[in-house]
Regions:
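Short, conserved loop/helix-junction motifs that constitute active-site signature segments
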Residues: 59-68, 115, 207-211, 245-249
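A glycine-rich beta-strand to alpha-helix segment
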Residues: 38-48, 52, 135-165
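Class I SAM-dependent methyltransferase SAM-binding "motif I" and its flanking Rossmann-like core
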Residues: 154-204
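A glycine- and small-aliphatic-rich helix-loop capping segment at beta-alpha/alpha-beta transitions
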Residues: 55-64, 87-88, 161-169, 233
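ATP/nucleoside-binding phosphotransfer catalytic cores, i.e., glycine-rich phosphate-binding loops
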Residues: 6, 201-262
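Ligand-binding beta-strand-loop-alpha-helix segment within the catalytic cores
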Residues: 1-6, 16, 65-148
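N-terminal glycine-/serine-/threonine-rich phosphate-binding loop
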Residues: 1-41
Length: 262
């Protein structure tokens, strides 16, 4: 597999990858604190970055995290009593806000000298999706965006194949391919019927415009197809949205041996 000119980093396993990425992020967080500014970490929910989040919590034990912002990529939308779409309840097992609170901020704050404040978790809002990119831009952009790829259709955030490559945050009708991938991402779903049919997401253009650095993380044998598609593309391929990493400033592909074995 070849990725053209984009850097590719290979690791023996997901733990090694997560530790290396956590080291890069921790260095940036420390530098931002010294400079007296916020550090925005772009985060996916789900499986791909779990080893990174765990390693980051270990590395940042005892640190001041009051300037850290967890900028999530997306959130599920469900119909409210009036039929209008609204963000999933954070208590729901699949809520991206809930994931950020429980699996990212929670472990980080448990050992922090100064925790991430409650207002330090950002998500796009279905009531005004475009405002999210404006907020990210006003904050100076995302210092490092962790990207993940859908296993079967290459979606990144909730952007399915064929999404506008320059698009901003939007309300996404989730295709069946993405919803099937989400059955594995959130295993408490008992059937496809339980997976929400809409989400609000950063757009592909948001990722490109707002990222100072981007790291596409591919871990495990289930991501072999994704690794092959992104590596062989050699550039952006509209049929595999995660290939947007090729368009990002300081974009890199990080994968473990199992994902690279395809």
């Amino acid at each position: 597999m070849s990725a053209g000119t984009i850097p590719v980093r290979r690791f023996p396993d997901g733990d090694a990858l997560g530790d290396a990425l956590a080291a890069e992020i921790a260095e940036g967080i420390a530098s931002a604190r010294i400079a007296g500014r916020r550090y925005l970490l772009g985060c996916p929910g789900g499986r791909s970055a779990r080893t990174t989040y765990a390693a980051l919590a270990r590395r940042l034990a005892g640190s001041d995290l009051g300037h850290l912002v967890i900028a999530m990529m997306d959130e599920y939308l469900v119909p409210g009593p009036d039929g209008a779409l609204r963000a999933a309840d954070p208590a729901a097992h699949y809520s991206c806000r809930g994931f950020a609170e429980r699996e990212i901020a929670g472990p980080l704050n448990a050992r922090a000298a100064r925790p991430i404040p409650a207002e330090g978790i950002w998500l796009p809002d279905a009531a005004d999706p475009a405002a999210y990119e404006a907020r990210l831009t006003a904050a100076g952009g995302i210092d490092l965006f962790i990207l993940a790829s859908g296993a079967s259709d290459g979606h990144v955030a909730f952007n399915p194949p064929g999404s506008d490559p320059d698009g901003g945050p939007w309300i996404v009708p989730l295709p069946e391919s993405t919803r099937r991938d989400n059955l594995a991402t959130f295993p408490d779903f008992r059937s496809l019927d339980e997976v929400p049919r809409h989400g609000v997401s950063v757009g592909l253009g948001t990722i490109v415009r707002c990222s100072r650095r981007a790291r596409l993380v591919l871990i495990g044998g289930g991501k072999r197809t994704a690794a092959a598609r992104v590596m062989d593309a050699g550039g952006y391929d509209a049929s595999w949205p995660a290939s947007v990493v090729h368009r990002c400033t300081d974009g890199e592909i990080w994968l473990d041996a199992a994902a690279a074995a395809g």
